[in-house]
């Protein structure tokens, strides 16, 4: 992996890093900043899709694997949670439509799409302010947590 000593020349998004290194997302190799394990191909795509920033340690670029992202997102939630509001309340507070706000998933940190934001609005689910940013749940995390609750409920029934 190439070294980037000058912070002004560092690409901070994974697609930009690929362009700078003259490679593709499919061929890039990058390690996790937390566990130092090389990201698998699917994790590289998920990191790029999540629109997270590449970080640099001693000029070497790093990303984050999915297990570390979920782990540190939970720690972030437990440490920095401040409040929960309904989507309509958030629109009133910010004087901005939900569609124009950047809201990430509280579990996997992916940006919520308009349909996922609308789902929070119509089902009256709360958005949570964590570390100064509002978060919700993406479609994948919403359904997987629902399935986990359903499975636990079935296991406890005799």
From Swiss-Prot:
Function per UniProt: Plays a major role in the induction and maintenance of cellular transformation. Acts mainly as an oncoprotein by stimulating the destruction of many host cell key regulatory proteins. E6 associates with host UBE3A/E6-AP ubiquitin-protein ligase, and inactivates tumor suppressors TP53 and TP73 by targeting them to the 26S proteasome for degradation. In turn, DNA damage and chromosomal instabilities increase and lead to cell proliferation and cancer development.
Family: Belongs to the papillomaviridae E6 protein family.
Motif PDZ-binding domain: chain residues: 156-158
Subcellular localization: Host cytoplasm; Host nucleus
Organism of this sequence: Human papillomavirus 68
Alphabetized GO MF terms: DNA binding; PDZ domain binding; zinc ion binding
Keywords from the named record: Activator, DNA-binding, Early protein, Host cytoplasm, Host nucleus, Host-virus interaction, Inhibition of host innate immune response by virus, Inhibition of host IRF3 by virus, Inhibition of host RLR pathway by virus, Metal-binding, Modulation of host cell apoptosis by virus, Oncogene, Transcription, Transcription regulation, Viral immunoevasion, Zinc, Zinc-finger
Protein name, UniProt field: Protein E6
Principal location: host cell
């Amino acid at each position: 992996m190439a070294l980037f000593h000058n912070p002004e020349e560092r690409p901070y998004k994974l697609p930009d890093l690929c362009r700078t290194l003259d490679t593709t997302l499919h061929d890039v190799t990058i390690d996790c900043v937390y566990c130092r394990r090389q990201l698998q191909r699917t994790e590289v795509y998920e990191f790029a899709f999540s629109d997270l920033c590449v970080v640099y340690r001693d000029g070497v670029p790093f990303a984050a694997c999915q297990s570390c992202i979920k782990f540190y997102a939970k720690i972030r939630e437990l440490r920095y949670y401040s409040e929960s509001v309904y989507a309509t309340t958030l629109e009133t507070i910010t004087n901005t439509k939900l569609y124009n706000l950047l809201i990430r998933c509280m579990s996997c940190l992916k940006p919520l799409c308009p349909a996922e934001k609308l789902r929070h609005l119509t089902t009256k689910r709360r958005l949570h302010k964590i570390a100064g940013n509002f978060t919700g749940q993406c479609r994948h995390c919403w359904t997987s947590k629902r399935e986990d609750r359903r499975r636990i409920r079935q296991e406890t029934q005799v």
